[in-house]
Amino acid sequence: MVSSLSRNGNSHHNGVNVAITSGFSTKLAPLPNGPLFGTDGIRGKAGDLLTAPFALELGFWAGQVLKANKVTPGPVIIGQDSRNSSDMLAMAMAAGLTSAGLEVWNLGLCPTPCVAHLTRISQAMGGIMISASHNPPEDNGIKFFNHEGTKLSQTLAQQIEDGLRGHLSFDRDRNREWGKTYHQANLVDTYCQFLQETLPENLDLQGMRVVLDLAWGASVEVAPKLFKALGAEVICLHDRPDGNRINVNCGSTHLDLLQQAIKEHQADLGFAFDGDADRVMAVDSQGRVVDGDYILYLWGKHLLEQGKLPHNLLIGTVMANLGFERAWEALGGQLMRTAVGDRHVQAQMWETGAILGGEQSGHIICHHHSFSGDGVQTALHLAALVRQSGESLATLVNESFQTYPQILRNIRVEDRDRRRYWQECTPVMEAVNQAEAAMGNTGRILVRPSGTEPLIRVMVESCSADDANYWVNYLVNVVEQHLAN
């Protein structure tokens, strides 16, 4: 156990150290200089920052902060995806939380929105999900929820980080209130029942053939169970927990195998989830990708026609396609854009009273039912919408909108400061301004650092595919030359 931390950090390791492992060493090394919490909690390679001793210490300080700010008296609920490091991190977090005197409910393997939902309905003090979402197997992450099942505020996240860095004091020797851990995998059934209750009464998917790509991840049990319960014929890909293969060439960011399976099985539609099932991408019977923009349009139109969409308002992000925006406006709707990240979408939904929002990448939030993105719920509701329409998903997509050609490229930039302050690089800004001036109102450009990976993302969108391709290549070359090297 790392020793007590003082306000000035004068412990034997200065209060700013975490364990790194070589084999099973607990040799201490400094925390990184930048913020620990990104847009979706703490992420990194398992065994580097994310070790058992670090998670133990993080759990302890999270427990102290949650206790000090508690609104409800209940437990802290922990879930995890299938990564090989998830057991280790979940158990270490539980040990840290119980050392702070808190009760822990461990759900085991489950989707992230399952943790969020159960946290909200159980009077829990907070929730924790061990997952790196769509990232590769060697990565992992720790994300926090407040008692309402929404993401922990930046203020509380900073307090937890202050504890880790030795800027808060606590005499551990006087702490004699130990918590307990309870294994509550059965509560995942409560979440499944909730999802069914959000669907139209007497919904019957008999005769619908659905392919599910479960990405070797957190949705392997929940998604097939629910679709089968509704009568659908279900064909599953990557359908068992596999910590070595989670997200590898499968799931919501790799749709080739799903598209192939839909054609081979002559399926009506298919869905691909990411590793923790908080996002989903759909594919129609023709093999076309139905991304978050299409899902928002179709679900939004359905709610608009029922009079259940306040102000005809959808919340999207800066990545939302112009074709989607202009088609939605033609229906009398309005699209409000936020920065990328479901945290920003959620905040804008609360501020405006919107009940439907999401991202092109497949994070969809519907306040009629939930307060967090839920891939399985979104897939079920899209299937329900298709069944109620009497049309195929392919027909609904044909009748919706044409996307503008949009090209997204990722450039690996290891230097964190170069990613954060890319706008201070004069050659890059000059190139962006040049491209924007050339395209005028026929397209747009977005350059931004990833919030979860060491990448700078360059997106160019234009009514002309040739223009989009030309300018994205031009900008990528400039970014690689001045930021990546």
From Swiss-Prot:
Gene name of the record: glmM
Keyword check for Transferase: no
Organism, as annotated: Rippkaea orientalis (strain PCC 8801 / RF-1)
Stored Gene3D superfamilies: Alpha-D-Glucose-1,6-Bisphosphate, subunit A, domain 3 (3.40.120.10), Alpha-D-phosphohexomutase, C-terminal domain (3.30.310.50)
Record carries keyword Phosphoprotein: yes
Post-translational modification note: Activated by phosphorylation.
Cofactor(s) needed for function: Mg(2+)
Biological-process GO terms, alphabetical: carbohydrate metabolic process; peptidoglycan biosynthetic process; UDP-N-acetylglucosamine biosynthetic process
Superkingdom of origin: Bacteria
One of the record's GO cellular component terms: cytosol
Function: Catalyzes the conversion of glucosamine-6-phosphate to glucosamine-1-phosphate.
NCBIfam families: glmM (TIGR01455)
Name of the molecule in the record: Phosphoglucosamine mutase
Cross-referenced InterPro entries: A-D-PHexomutase_a/b/a-I, A-D-PHexomutase_a/b/a-I/II/III, A-D-PHexomutase_a/b/a-II, A-D-PHexomutase_a/b/a-III, A-D-PHexomutase_C, A-D-PHexomutase_C_sf, A-D-PHexomutase_CS, Alpha-D-phosphohexomutase_SF
Amino-acid positions noted as binding Mg(2+) in the UniProt annotation, renumbered to this chain: 133, 274, 276, 278
Catalytic residues identified in the record: 133
Entry keywords, A to Z: Isomerase, Magnesium, Metal-binding, Phosphoprotein
